[in-house]
């Protein structure tokens, strides 16, 4: 298990560097003479027509609705594996990261709402600081190599996965609008078909892919966010076949490099370009960016630590063997790396609002995530032994 986790984290480390490059490139283009080219490229209309079906969207929405559906497919596969066989497969293993994740979502959301109380437009962004970027957080931890105990890596992985599950629920409940009954019926039929394939023991991925595409289009047209289709597909793909092979893990391993080295960097490049030229100091310290940045920098670690400590003291959970609070605390700080997940929620929260709010949300996310990453990295580096364990 240790070797598998280290291989996974080494890939995430390289992906984290690529994410930083994508963000830097986006910021450079958005604040240079290339800004018009950058915005024009993302606004390019892309049309797909098959018979009566006509999908016509800007490139940015194809990235956010299409590529990110594949990312959520991967997240769904990871969640299912961990729930059935991994770090979340027993109550004892799942208790501490579950309480930590709940605290790490509630407190940041509360801080954001505190700064944005009374403004119905900006209050829609309450979930932005509640997210953790699993790829980036694990990538930062991976920079410390073998100095990090495996139990600590598993704790962060489990916490981040539960956090992702919470984000999925939030998107389904709070960011779905103008529902289409016909599209939901078609989506339901596709889901029934996927479940039937699972119950019949079908392990070939092609049938799931065909029905999954139907489901994605139906969900896209339904008013429910299309990324949820990826999660549903993931939960329907069998974890184990009769011969002991794992179709789910095979697909997960196939998707990982695409997600790490293409999907997330492209998403970051498309969404991280914030034009700073028209922003005044008053704008930069307005409730949206401040609420998000403080939610990530302070709310995340406070929430994770508070709920974890309470759960242990109430004997609802226990610390992993060989791990103390001095190791948990910097990991809690790393959970404030919202980055791509926070930007994704921001794109949903302010989709119908003035574009300025989206820019402010992305700026707050960048500031909060970068500071959380630096604090988490240097703090964890200080408390860990100098040599590998």
Curated annotation (Swiss-Prot):
Which range is the signal sequence, renumbered to this chain?
Answer: none
Q: Which domain of life is it from?
A: Bacteria
Topology in the membrane?
A: Multi-pass membrane protein
Reaction(s) catalysed by this chain's protein: Na(+)(in) + 2 H(+)(out) = Na(+)(out) + 2 H(+)(in)
Q: Which GO terms describe its cellular component?
A: plasma membrane
Question: What keywords are annotated for this sequence in UniProt?
Answer: Antiport, Cell inner membrane, Cell membrane, Ion transport, Membrane, Sodium, Sodium transport, Transmembrane, Transmembrane helix, Transport
The record's InterPro entries line, in alphabetical order, gives: Na/H_antiporter_dom_sf, NhaA
Q: Is Oxidoreductase one of the keywords UniProt gives this record?
A: no
| Localization (cell) | Cell inner membrane
Q: Name one GO biological process term.
A: regulation of pH
**Which cysteines in this chain are paired by disulphide bridges?**
none
Q: Does the keyword Transmembrane helix apply?
A: yes
Q: Which residues cross the membrane?
A: 17-37, 59-79, 95-115, 124-144, 154-174, 177-197, 213-233, 261-281, 287-307, 328-348, 363-383
Q: Which GO terms describe its molecular function?
A: sodium:proton antiporter activity
Q: Which HAMAP family match?
A: NhaA
Chain's role:
Na(+)/H(+) antiporter that extrudes sodium in exchange for external protons.
Q: Which NCBIfam families match?
A: NhaA, PRK09560.1, PRK09561.1
UniProt family annotation: Belongs to the NhaA Na(+)/H(+) (TC 2.A.33) antiporter family.
Q: Which PANTHER family match?
A: NA(+)_H(+) ANTIPORTER NHAA, SODIUM ION/PROTON ANTIPORTER NHAA-RELATED
Name of the protein this chain belongs to: Na(+)/H(+) antiporter NhaA
What organism does the record attribute this protein to?
Shewanella sp. (strain MR-7)
């Amino acid at each position: 298990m240790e070797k598998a986790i280290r291989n996974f984290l080494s890939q995430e480390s390289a992906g984290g560097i690529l994410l930083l490059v994508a963000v830097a490139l986006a910021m450079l283009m958005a604040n240079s003479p290339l800004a018009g080219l950058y915005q024009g490229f993302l606004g390019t209309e892309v049309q797909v027509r098959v018979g009566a079906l006509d999908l016509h969207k800007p490139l940015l929405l194809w990235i956010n609705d299409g590529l990110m559906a594949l990312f959520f497919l991967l997240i769904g596969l990871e969640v299912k594996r961990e729930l059935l066989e991994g770090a979340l497969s027993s109550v004892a293993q799942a208790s501490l990261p579950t309480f930590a994740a709940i605290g790490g979502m509630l407190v940041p959301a509360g801080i954001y709402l505190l700064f944005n109380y009374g403004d119905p437009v900006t209050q829609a962004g309450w979930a932005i600081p509640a997210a953790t970027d699993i790829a980036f957080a694990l990538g930062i931890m991976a920079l410390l190599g073998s100095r990090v105990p495996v139990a600590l890596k598993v704790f962060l992985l489990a916490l981040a996965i539960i956090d992702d599950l919470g984000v999925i629920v939030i998107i389904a409940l709070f960011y779905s609008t103008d529902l289409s009954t016909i599209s939901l019926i078609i989506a339901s039929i596709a889901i029934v078909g996927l479940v039937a394939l699972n119950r019949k023991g079908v392990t070939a991925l092609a049938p799931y892919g065909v029905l999954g595409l139907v489901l994605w289009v139906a969900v896209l047209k339904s008013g429910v966010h299309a990324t949820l289709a990826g999660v549903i597909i993931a939960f329907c793909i069998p974890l184990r076949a009769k011969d002991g092979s794992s179709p789910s893990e095979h697909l997960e391993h196939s998707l990982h490099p695409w997600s790490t080295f293409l999907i997330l960097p492209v998403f970051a490049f498309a969404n991280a370009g914030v034009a700073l030229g028209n922003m005044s100091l008053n704008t930069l310290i307005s409730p949206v960016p401040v609420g998000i940045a403080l939610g990530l920098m302070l709310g995340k670690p406070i929430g994770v630590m508070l709920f974890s400590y309470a759960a242990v003291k109430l004997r609802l959970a226990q610390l992993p063997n060989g791990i103390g609070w001095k190791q948990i605390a910097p990991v809690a700080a790393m959970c404030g790396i919202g980055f791509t997940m926070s930007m994704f929620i921001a794109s949903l929260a302010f989709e119908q609002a003035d574009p300025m709010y989206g820019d402010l949300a992305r700026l707050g996310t960048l500031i909060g995530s970068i500071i959380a990453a630096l604090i988490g990295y240097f703090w964890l580096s200080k408390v860990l032994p100098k040599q590998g364990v």
